[in-house]
Amino acid sequence: MAFIESSSGKQPSLFSAIAIGVGCIVGSGWLFASYKASKFAGPVAIGSWVIGALLALMIALLLAEIATFYSKETGLFARLLTITHNGDFGFINASSNWFATIITIPAEAEASIQYLAQAFPKISNSVFNNDHFTHLGIAVVCLLMVFYGFLNYWGIKLLAKANNTITVFKLTVPALTAIIFMAASFHPENFSSYHGTIAPYGYDKMFTAVVTCGIFYSFYGFSMITVFSKELKNPQRNIPLALAGSVLICLVIYLMLQISFIGAIEPSEIIGGWHTLDFTSPLAQLAIILGINWIAVVLYVDA
C-alpha cells in the first residue's frame, strides 16, 4: 500500500494506523443502523452500540496480543489462526473471512444505490421498491460492484495515498450530521414517551439488535490494522492502541448518531411505536423533513 511505502521511507505512525482501522470500520453501516436499531429496540438501542463496541474491543485486544507477538510475521492476517491454533482451523476461519469480505462488497454497493435512488424520485421506484431491489436495481448494484473492482485495481495507489484524508472525511460527515440534527431538532421526551420507558420492547431487544440491526457489522474492519503490523512503527505499542482507539472513536460517532436520530424524530411519528417508522434512506430523509437539505445532499454524496 502506498501509505506504507512513503517516499521518505518512514514507517506509518499511530495516527496512520488508527486511520487504517477507522477507515475500514466506517462504511455503509452508519447510514442505516441507527434507524434499524431504533425501529427494532427503541431508545434502548443506545445500549446496543455499547455492547457491540465491547464485543469488538474484546476481539481487538485478543488480536492485539497475537499481532504484537508476531508483528514481524509476513502475511499475519491471513495466517493468524494457523499460528494460534492449527492449519485446519486456520483454513476454515480464513475461508469464512473470505466469504465475509465477499458479502461486504455487494452490501456496500446496495447501500449506495438505496440511498442514491432516493435522490432521484422519478427513478426511485424502478430501482428500489417495497423494501426490495427490483431487477433493474440488482443490475445497477452489479454494475457498481464492477466499478468498485476497477477502482481498486487501478486506483488503489491514489486512494492509499489519500487514506488519512479520506478517513477524516468519513468521520466528519457522520459527526457533523449528528451535531446538526441535535441543533435542529431534539425532543428529550422521545427517549421514554412510548410506553413510558427507554425499552418499550424489552431489554432483550438491546442484545438482539447488536446482531440483527447491523450494529456489530458497523464495527467490522478494525482487524485490517494487523495486515500492516510488519510495517508499523513500534508495533508492540501502536497495534493495541490503534485497534482499541479505532473501535472507541467509532463508538463515539455511532452513539452521537443514535442519540441524535432518536431525538430528532417528531414525537407524533412514534405515537404508534418505534416499529412504525418507515424510511428507505433514513438519515437523508430525516434531514429533508427537518429542512436541512444541504445535509441531505452531503449524505447522498457520502453514500
Labelled PLM ranges:
Residues 40, 109-144, 186-208, 276, ...:
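Inter-helical loop and helix-membrane interface segments of multi-pass membrane transporters/permeases
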Residues 75-86, 118-123, 248-303:
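TM-loop-TM module centered on a large, flexible mid-protein loop between adjacent transmembrane helices
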Residues 9, 32-137, 246-249, 256, ...:
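Extracellular loop-to-transmembrane helix junctions
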Residues 12-31, 141-144, 181-184, 198-264, ...:
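Hydrophobic, membrane-embedded alpha-helices of multi-pass small-molecule transporters
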Residues 116, 136-188, 220, 243-248:
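Membrane-interface loop-to-helix entry segments
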Residues 1-11:
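Short, Lys/Arg-rich, polar N-terminal cytosolic tail immediately upstream
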Residues 28-30, 52-65, 144-153, 222-223:
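Central hydrophobic cores of alpha-helical transmembrane segments in multi-pass inner-membrane proteins
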Residues 46, 94-97, 161-167, 240-248, ...:
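Internal alpha-helical transmembrane segments of multi-pass membrane proteins, especially GPCRs
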